[in-house]
Swiss-Prot record:
Membrane topology: Multi-pass membrane protein
Protein name: Glycerol-3-phosphate acyltransferase
GO molecular function, one term: acyl-phosphate glycerol-3-phosphate acyltransferase activity
Highest rank taxon of the organism: Bacteria
Keyword Membrane: yes
Membrane-spanning ranges: 8-28, 53-73, 81-101, 116-136, 155-175
Lineage of producing organism: Bacteria, Pseudomonadati, Pseudomonadota, Gammaproteobacteria, Thiotrichales
Top-tier EC class: transferase
EC number: 2.3.1.275
Amino acid sequence: MNFLNFSILIFAYLLGSINSAIIVCYIFRLPSPRSVGSGNPGTTNVLRIGGKVLAAITLIFDILKGLVPVVIAKVLTGNDFITACTALYAILGHIFPIFFGFKGGKGVATLIGTLFGFSWILGLIFVITWLCVAIITRYSSLSALVATVIASFSVIFTSDLQVAAPFLIIAIIILVKHKGNIQRLISGQESKIGDKAKAKNDSN
């Protein structure tokens, strides 16, 4: 691995480690998302704490954290494997941020950014899958999980297995981070879209 590739991966991880939920709440003098609600520093908890506008800001930044480094890797290296690894490092930064004690969000919004950066088709697959599952089931968490798996595995059909591997790892990590959501889905206790927010049901 040359210095450029190494630098891009480190940049992706460090950018991913900037937790927008925590920063947005700090700037607007709101309680830390790590100490209220679900305790998850992600968009859903910011929505609960600060409302739709601040949640939208958080969501946009989380998406950009995945999009920007992947686009940079794609343009500067022209190497699909390095670009896919860059996506993985951005997700690792978001979920295990060095700046916040390695305790971050669940990675779904950042994954959306990496998918669109890698291939707009993959990003579109994620969005369409999410919408279809959400309309049918009204479960935001289930929509995110199904979209994550389908979009990540779709890389296999557009690239070789080496390039797909980082995205498959991402899917596994995100599934593990949603273990609580999966348990509630199985037990029928997961909240649906439009239900009154429940502190433990964050999907992002």
